[in-house]
UniProtKB/Swiss-Prot annotation:
Gene: aroC
CC cofactor note: Reduced FMN (FMNH(2)).
Name of the molecule in the record: Chorismate synthase
Organism of origin: Sphingopyxis alaskensis (strain DSM 13593 / LMG 18877 / RB2256) (Sphingomonas alaskensis)
Source organism superkingdom: Bacteria
EC number: 4.2.3.5
Record lineage: Bacteria, Pseudomonadati, Pseudomonadota, Alphaproteobacteria, Sphingomonadales
InterPro entries: Chorismate_synth, Chorismate_synth_AroC_sf, Chorismate_synthase_CS
Family the UniProt entry places it in: Belongs to the chorismate synthase family.
Length: 358
């Protein structure tokens, strides 16, 4: 299987399967002499780690990361950084039923159609478990962009959205939903309980903003910052849609409404102040100095207890019920993953910009 790598200068590759002995990432192109230890990576993995509430999979994985290469005496050496996370709580017997039948909405059939073989234990590479490696790699990328602050939050679950008037960034780490609206988080408790008891699942929308990004990162046409961000987010398992800034909403605006008006800078510099940010901090594929903003749509988890009509490998009609431990809303734990992909993309573009423009 190819296409497991992302990035141009800062390039990372993820490896491993959901029910294999381990998974991980190799980060290549990281500048030398940056301070790095497992302690710099672990807090981000802990945010994504499963089994921390009844609203996520009950698979108990400590997700302890090990740095195998690329670091000497606490500093990056400029050589590939290999990161490994062991799997310790696999229950492959739960997946016997899907060895011969495909889960609608999952990658089972597509993998069989392409490769003629698939690891049905937890979905293999198509499992959300793969994203642990992205989060580890993203923690390394953050060291390359210390001037940038990245925050992601769940903005909507099952069609129930937060109220922007109640937005409080400090609330994100105070509830199991990465939710900045306490009232919405309370509603989601009941919403998630209802879906789980029904043997079903829910989708979610994640919003992510990166502040401190200077003007100038990105490139025209085929290396646009927004196109790379879209590819980064769409590469996350279970993601079905990405918006930059106002996204699809711009199609409903007039030109004067969509434009982000500029005024002379309040700090006296030659950089303008913007009065709005419909562009999401990117114009012509290049950052403007405003916050870079993306919205990411996660589909409902395909592995559910509700019987779903399908076909088995013999071509026979059947119903499938996916037993085992699964996220009733995979988007909840998607927030740290979206942050990681934002960091990896921005770090890559910072190094690209430095290579071309100094």
């Amino acid at each position: 299987m190819s296409f497991n790598s992302f990035g141009r200068v800062l390039r990372f590759t993820t490896w491993g399967e959901s029910h294999g002995p381990a998974l991980g990432a190799v980060v290549d192109g990281c500048p030398p002499r940056l301070s790095l230890s497992e302690a710099d990576i672990q807090p981000f993995l802990d945010k994504r780690r499963p089994g921390q509430s009844r609203h996520t999979t009950q698979r108990q994985e400590p997700d302890q990361v090990r740095i195998l290469s690329g670091v000497f005496e606490g500093k990056t050496t400029g050589t590939p950084i290999s990161l490994m996370i062991e799997n310790v709580d696999q229950r492959s017997k739960d997946y016997g039923e899907i060895a011969q039948a495909w889960r609608p909405g999952h990658a089972d059939y597509a993998y069989d159609a392409k490769y003629g073989i698939r690891d049905y234990r937890g979905g293999g590479r198509s499992s959300a478990r793969e994203t642990a490696a992205r989060v580890a790699a993203g923690a390394v990328a953050r060291l390359v962009i210390p001037e940038v602050q990245i925050h992601a939050w769940v903005a909507e679950i099952g069609g129930d959205a937060i109220d922007p008037a109640n937005f409080d960034l400090e609330e994100i780490d105070r509830n199991p939903f990465f939710c900045p609206d306490p009232a919405a988080a309370q509603r989601w408790e009941a919403l998630m309980d209802s879906a789980r008891k029904a043997g079903s699942s829910l989708g979610a929308v994640i919003e992510c903003a990166a502040s401190g990004v200077p003007a100038g990162w990105g490139a025209p046409v085929y290396a646009k910052l927004d196109s790379d961000l879209a590819a980064a987010m769409m590469g996350i398992n279970a993601v079905k849609g990405v918006e930059i800034g106002a996204g699809f909403g711009v199609a409903r605006l007039r030109g004067e409404e969509n434009a982000d008006p500029m005024r002379p800078a309040s700090d006296g510099s030659n950089r303008p102040d913007f009065l709005s940010n419909n562009a999401g901090g990117i114009a012509g594929g290049i950052s403007t100095g405003q916050p870079v903003v993306v919205r990411v749509a996660f589909k409902p988890t395909s592995s559910i207890l509700t019987p779903v009509p399908t076909v088995n490998k013999a071509g026979e009609a059947t119903d499938i019920v996916t037993r085992g431990r699964h996220d009733p809303c995979v988007g909840i734990r998607g927030a740290p993953v979206v942050e990681a992909m934002m960091a990896l993309t921005l770090a890559d573009h910072k190094l690209l910009h430095r290579a071309q423009c100094g």
